[in-house]
Amino acid sequence: MTMPLRGLGPPDDTGVREVSTGDDHHYAMWDAAYVLGALSAADRREFEAHLAGCPECRGAVTELCGVPALLSQLDRDEVAAISESAPTVVASGLSPELLPSLLAAVHRRRRRTRLITWVASSAAAAVLAIGVLVGVQGHSAAPQRAAVSALPMAQVGTQLLASTVSISGEPWGTFINLRCVCLAPPYASHDTLAMVVVGRDGSQTRLATWLAEPGHTATPAGSISTPVDQIAAVQVVAADTGQVLLQRSL
């Protein structure tokens, strides 16, 4: 059985419905008109009743269901160009070149749409980058943390640890950073240490804890709201007992 040529509307007296469809029923030419919404209400109900029992017409409608979406993406100029380039549709059916022309036009339109979207996205990204750059520059204009020298800490309860401490005053308090190396032999136990800030009022605040691993340098850091001039000392202590091992008095 040969596939029918699909028409644009229901059969009429112009001879269009005389085209052979292979199954010789007059509904074979109604599929395109149904998909495009060109049938009258009565014809639409009649065709839908026919579809319930005709797999041929159901398949034809399925094949054409994407055409309205394709047509909706064409502008007036593209439709005019297709009309000029496509051969005239005669009573024997639609030209086989029409659908490829539609698809090519839609492809060009989508390509332009993707290009416009890409340009718009790039422009938005550029604006965002400029905003971030301005924000970073504005932030960098704020006072920077002054370089702070690393001060050695005195060994108090051990000779197996050595450390330096850097103390930086900030508008919000104090930032403290240690570089603590464990000098114990490889077979020594890995003790847990803690950094403690001693205030001039006698308060003690634990800022960080870490594991002392022989031969390795730990870099614990912490912040505290206490101003630098209110800090009496920074200590490294045994986390479990509180024994002072290293200390830097201020």
Swiss-Prot record:
Induction line: Constitutively expressed from a very weak SigL-independent promoter during growth in culture. Also weakly autoregulated. Forms an operon with sigL.
The species this protein was found in: Mycobacterium tuberculosis (strain ATCC 25618 / H37Rv)
Outcome following mutation: residue 65 to S: No change in Zn(2+)-binding
Cofactor needs: Zn(2+)
Source organism, top-level taxon: Bacteria
Intrachain disulfide bonds: none
Phenotype of the disrupted gene, per the record: In a double sigL-rslA disruption mutant, no visible phenotype; not more susceptible than the parental strain to several oxidative and nitrosative stresses. Infected DBA/2 mice showed a significantly prolonged survival time relative to mice infected with wild-type bacteria, although bacteria proliferate normally.
Location relative to the cell: Cell membrane
An example molecular function term from Gene Ontology annotations: zinc ion binding
Cellular component terms per the entry's GO annotation: plasma membrane
Matches recorded under Gene3D superfamilies: Anti-sigma factor, zinc-finger domain
Coiled coil: none
Cofactor comment text: Binds 1 Zn(2+) ion per subunit.
InterPro entries: Anti-sigma-K/W_factor, Anti_sigma_zinc_sf, Znf_put
Bilayer-crossing regions: 116-136
One Pfam assignment: zf-HC2
Protein name per its UniProtKB record: Anti-sigma-L factor RslA
Positions contributing to Zn(2+) binding: 25, 50, 54, 57
Topology, Extracellular side: 137-250
Subunit: Interacts with ECF RNA polymerase sigma factor SigL; this should inhibit the interaction of SigL with the RNA polymerase catalytic core.
Protein encoded by which gene: rslA
Job of this protein: An anti-sigma factor for extracytoplasmic function (ECF) sigma factor SigL. ECF sigma factors are held in an inactive form by an anti-sigma factor until released by regulated intramembrane proteolysis (RIP). RIP occurs when an extracytoplasmic signal triggers a concerted proteolytic cascade to transmit information and elicit cellular responses.
Cytoplasmic side: 1-115
Domain notes: The cytosolic domain interacts with sigma factor SigL.
Family label: Belongs to the zinc-associated anti-sigma factor (ZAS) superfamily.
Keywords linked to the UniProt accession: Cell membrane, Membrane, Metal-binding, Transcription, Transcription regulation, Transmembrane, Transmembrane helix, Virulence, Zinc
Membrane association type: Single-pass membrane protein
